[in-house]
């Protein structure tokens, strides 16, 4: 197959940042993707509908002329979040989901939830009105190994929450383990998972073998090869409970290349090329559209995009920049460590 035409994709987990960084990265998303769930972990975080309204306006202002893109806003869940404010934002159409960050789990998550009981009034209201909860599924207790955080989160936090509130709609974001995949598959209702393009490509060797490679470090951290293969199988299966969420997370290079580097991989610019490569390897190009363009909208109660894009396979590798330049500084682009021959042509 030399070309494939699919409905315009969406990104169900995206970091756009703010200010000069937002202005420098947004075109890489809006050029290809029609919609994206926007992460709220700014400094300070997006915790109220008023915050979300202002952030959405900044995003739309940063869009290049002629780009059609809809930011789907989220709120950062805290122990003091107002159920009434969440419901008002959801009913207005502004808020698509609320994001749960266990405190300390990832970038700018220190204001997240430490005591789930204090967040229950909001979660109960969300369950009542059908508003999804997006979760960063990792525990942060120091005695838990970083490679086990997702599995322990499922057992100690997520499963008890879902048993208590079975009507709450939950998205496990950036699933990285076979444990997460199996847990989603076993659920009868109200559970789905997003998968990144980079977790389909790298395992933890990419970070550690031959020297520490900070531009492959993200949270949740890449896992063993058996987990990567489980993610691939889920992504290409056509199962409607799995969909693309890039978790594209730009950091300027000095914040990655240092003694205590930030977690995050910047993938927006080459995500679709990487995915076409992966799905071709798995003999599943006919299911790429489901993963990128159909399953996510169905889960979030939206219509799929009417616009189409075409990916073409060319003989010579596609050349992506090693870095992009923003007003905040240079950002290194994800390198899948093999040539990419698929690219978006229309």
From Swiss-Prot:
Annotated cofactor note: Binds 2 Zn(2+) ions per subunit.
A Pfam family of this chain: Amidohydro_1
Alphabetical list of InterPro entries matching this protein: Amidohydro-rel, DHOdimr, Dihydroorotase_CS, Metal_Hydrolase
Active-site residues per Swiss-Prot or TrEMBL entry: 247
PROSITE patterns: DIHYDROOROTASE_1, DIHYDROOROTASE_2
Cofactors, names only: Zn(2+)
Swiss-Prot/TrEMBL catalytic activity: (S)-dihydroorotate + H2O = N-carbamoyl-L-aspartate + H(+)
GO CC annotations on file: cytosol
Pathway annotation: Pyrimidine metabolism; UMP biosynthesis via de novo pathway; (S)-dihydroorotate from bicarbonate: step 3/3
GO MF: dihydroorotase activity; zinc ion binding
Enzyme Commission identifier(s): 3.5.2.3
Ligand binding (substrate): 15-17, 41, 136, 219, 251, 263
GO biological process terms on file: 'de novo' pyrimidine nucleobase biosynthetic process; 'de novo' UMP biosynthetic process
Keyword 4Fe-4S: no
CDD domains on file: DHOase
Protein residues bound to Zn(2+) 2: 99, 136, 174
Binding site residues for Zn(2+) 1: 13, 15, 99, 247
Keywords: Hydrolase, Metal-binding, Pyrimidine biosynthesis, Zinc
Modified residues (N6-carboxylysine): 99
EC main group: hydrolase
NCBIfam families xref list: pyrC_dimer
Free-text function comment from the UniProt entry: Catalyzes the reversible cyclization of carbamoyl aspartate to dihydroorotate.
PANTHER family associated with the record: DIHYDROOROTASE
Assembly and binders: Homodimer.
Similarity field: Belongs to the metallo-dependent hydrolases superfamily. DHOase family. Class II DHOase subfamily.
This protein's name: Dihydroorotase
Lineage: Bacteria, Pseudomonadati, Pseudomonadota, Alphaproteobacteria, Hyphomicrobiales
């Amino acid at each position: 197959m030399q070309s494939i035409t699919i409905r315009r994709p969406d990104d169900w987990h995206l970091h756009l940042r703010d200010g000069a960084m937002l202005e420098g990265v947004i075109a890489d998303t809006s050029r290809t993707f029609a919609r994206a769930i926007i992460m709220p972990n700014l400094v300070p975080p997006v915790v109220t509908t008023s915050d979300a309204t202002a952030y959405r306006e900044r995003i739309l202002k940063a869009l290049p002329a002629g780009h059609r893109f809809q930011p789907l806003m989220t709120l950062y869940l805290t122990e003091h979040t107002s159920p009434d404010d969440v419901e008002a934002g959801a009913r207005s159409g502004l808020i698509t989901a609320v994001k749960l960050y266990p405190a300390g789990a990832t970038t700018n998550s220190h204001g997240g939830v430490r005591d789930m009981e204090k967040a229950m009034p909001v979660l109960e209201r969300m369950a009542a009105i059908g508003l999804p909860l997006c979760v960063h599924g990792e525990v942060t207790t120091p005695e838990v190994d970083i490679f086990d955080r997702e599995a322990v989160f499922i057992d100690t936090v997520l499963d008890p929450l879902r048993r208590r509130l079975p009507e709450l709609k939950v998205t496990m974001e950036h699933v990285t383990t076979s444990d997460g995949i199996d847990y989603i598959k076993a659920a009868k209702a109200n559970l789905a998972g997003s998968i990144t393009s980079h977790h389909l490509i790298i395992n933890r060797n990419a970070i550690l073998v031959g020297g520490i490679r900070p531009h492959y470090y993200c949270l949740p951290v890449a896992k063993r090869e058996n987990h990567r293969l489980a993610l691939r199988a889920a992504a290409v299966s056509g199962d409607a409970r799995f969909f693309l969420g890039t978790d594209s997370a730009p950091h300027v290079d000095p914040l990655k290349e240092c003694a205590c580097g930030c977690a995050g991989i910047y993938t927006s610019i080459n995500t679709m090329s990487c995915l076409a490569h992966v799905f071709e390897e798995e003999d599943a190009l006919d299911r790429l559209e489901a993963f990128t363009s159909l399953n996510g909208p169905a889960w979030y109660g939206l219509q799929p995009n009417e616009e189409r894009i075409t990916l073409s396979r060319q003989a010579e590798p596609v050349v992506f920049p090693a870095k992009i330049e923003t007003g905040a500084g240079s950002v290194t682009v994800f390198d899948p460590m093999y040539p990419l021959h698929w690219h978006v042509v229309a």
